[in-house]
């Protein structure tokens, strides 16, 4: 009796404790089931991610993330030339950074005598403190 109880507990521990038995990442994963039939314009896309069949999805795909976060991801066939070109374009395009208000060329120099938050912090970090 004790052996069968111990064996049952061992089976339960193994069944629930081994990664991969509940899915590739331990939870639900969004997968593309089919590809978009139309070309996706670069101006509506901010980035992309790859979907691999080895990660639990049925087809390989590129999921393009739209600029508007409220819109759904767009699925495309990674073998298509336009998809590869769009991926290369996104890889080359740097993420836009907002300039610091009130500073010139991020040097910590205030514009027209105005002190901005970024300028003050930059000046403090560049000014050596000592006797």
From Swiss-Prot:
Swiss-Prot/TrEMBL keywords: Chemotaxis, Cytokine, Disulfide bond, Inflammatory response, Secreted, Signal
CDD domains linked to this entry: Chemokine_CC_DCCL (cd01119)
GO biological process terms on file: antimicrobial humoral immune response mediated by antimicrobial peptide; CCL21-activated CCR7 signaling pathway; cellular response to prostaglandin E stimulus; chemokine-mediated signaling pathway; dendritic cell chemotaxis; eosinophil chemotaxis; establishment of T cell polarity; inflammatory response
Keyword Kinase part of the UniProt annotation: no
Places the protein is found: Secreted
Keyword Disulfide bond included in the entry's annotation: yes
S-S pairs: 31-57, 32-75, 103-119
GO CC, one annotated term: extracellular space
InterPro entries: Chemokine_b/g/d, Chemokine_CC_DCCL, Chemokine_IL8-like_dom, Interleukin_8-like_sf
Region listing for Disordered, in residue ranges: 89-131
Listed Gene3D superfamilies: 2.40.50.40
SUPFAM superfamilies: Interleukin 8-like chemokines (SSF54117)
Gene Ontology terms, MF aspect: CCR chemokine receptor binding; chemokine activity; chemokine receptor binding
Position of the signal peptide: 1-23
Protein function: Inhibits hemopoiesis and stimulates chemotaxis. Chemotactic in vitro for thymocytes and activated T-cells, but not for B-cells, macrophages, or neutrophils. Shows preferential activity towards naive T-cells. May play a role in mediating homing of lymphocytes to secondary lymphoid organs. Binds to atypical chemokine receptor ACKR4 and mediates the recruitment of beta-arrestin (ARRB1/2) to ACKR4.
Family per record: Belongs to the intercrine beta (chemokine CC) family.
Subunit and partners: Monomer. Binds to CCR7. Interacts with PDPN; relocalizes PDPN to the basolateral membrane. Interacts with TNFAIP6 (via Link domain). Interacts with GPR174.
PANTHER family reported for this sequence: C-C MOTIF CHEMOKINE 21, SMALL INDUCIBLE CYTOKINE A
Descriptive protein name: C-C motif chemokine 21
Taxonomic source organism: Macaca mulatta (Rhesus macaque)
Encoding gene (name): CCL21
């Amino acid at each position: 009796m004790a052996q069968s109880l111990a064996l049952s507990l061992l089976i339960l521990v193994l069944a629930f404790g081994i990664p991969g038995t509940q899915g590739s990442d331990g939870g639900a994963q969004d997968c593309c089931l089919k590809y978009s039939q139309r070309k996706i314009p670069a101006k509506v896309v901010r980035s992309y991610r790859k979907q691999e069949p080895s990660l639990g999805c049925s087809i390989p795909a590129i999921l393009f993330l739209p600029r508007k976060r409220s819109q759904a991801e767009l699925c495309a066939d990674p073998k298509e030339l336009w998809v590869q070109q769009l991926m290369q374009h996104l890889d080359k395009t740097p993420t836009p950074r907002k300039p610091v208000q009130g500073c010139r060329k991020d040097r910590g120099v205030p514009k027209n005598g105005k002190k901005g938050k970024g300028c003050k912090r930059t000046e403090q970090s560049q000014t050596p403190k000592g006797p």
